[in-house]
A protein has these predicted regions:
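Bacterial N-terminal signal peptides that target proteins for export
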Residues: 1-9
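Extracellular/lumenal and peripheral-membrane lipid-interaction modules
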Residues: 21-194
Length: 194
């Protein structure tokens, strides 16, 4: 009788543990809050854009990033950024200093490495240059021809800078080691465990 009760209690404990740890999630709001905090504490975050022939040498300072999660196409992370871009542009043999506000938008997937969540496979969907000066027009024309290089620079940046770290409490830290899959849903990231 006692053995039966012990087995029943052990089975119940295992069931409760497994059902409580089947998945964990991070909401879009939590993700955006973490990104905003990271941008505040780790500035300046600069993405360098340089062409081999040195016609362009720009630094992109990330001021703001807003993340929108969607289930579309198997799960996407859509990011709208506000940045300041500054540097030099060589036009007709003349170096021209420039500064403008650049607002790129892109979509990507996610990967987890240890306890860090990274954006992967960033694909630009839109780039807006704010302003209407001559240098802004030249920047628009130059960026149009630099689409692939700009996309690669964004992808490289987010491949090494996590957007979220699973370290907010002991349960999150422990669960991070057991994540087997990530599912992007509308408004949350689900971490599948076991």
């Amino acid at each position: 009788m006692m053995k039966k009760k012990l087995m029943w209690l052990a089975g119940l404990a295992v069931t409760v543990m497994l059902s409580g740890c089947s998945d964990m999630s991070v909401t879009e709001e939590e993700l955006n809050h973490e990104v905003a905090q990271r941008l505040q504490t780790s500035q300046p975050d600069i993405i360098q854009l340089t062409l081999e022939d040195s016609t362009l040498n720009l630094d992109l300072l990330i001021k703001q990033a807003k993340i929108d999660l969607t289930q579309r196409d198997g799960g996407l992370v859509m990011v709208d950024m506000k940045t300041d871009i500054r540097g030099t542009l060589n036009v007709f043999g003349q170096d021209m200093s420039m500064k403008a506000q650049l607002d790129p938008s892109f979509e990507s997937g996610l990967r987890i490495e240890e306890d860090r969540v990274y954006l992967v496979g960033a694909k630009l969907t839109q780039v807006t240059v704010q302003g209407s000066s001559i240098s802004d027009q030249m920047l628009r024309n130059t960026l149009g021809s630099l689409h692939d290089e700009f996309e690669k620079a964004l992808a490289d940046y987010f491949n090494t800078h996590p957007v979220y770290v699973l370290d907010h409490d002991a349960m999150e830290k422990a669960a991070a080691r057991m994540v087997k899959n990530i599912v992007i849903t509308d408004d949350s990231i689900e971490f599948m465990i076991f």
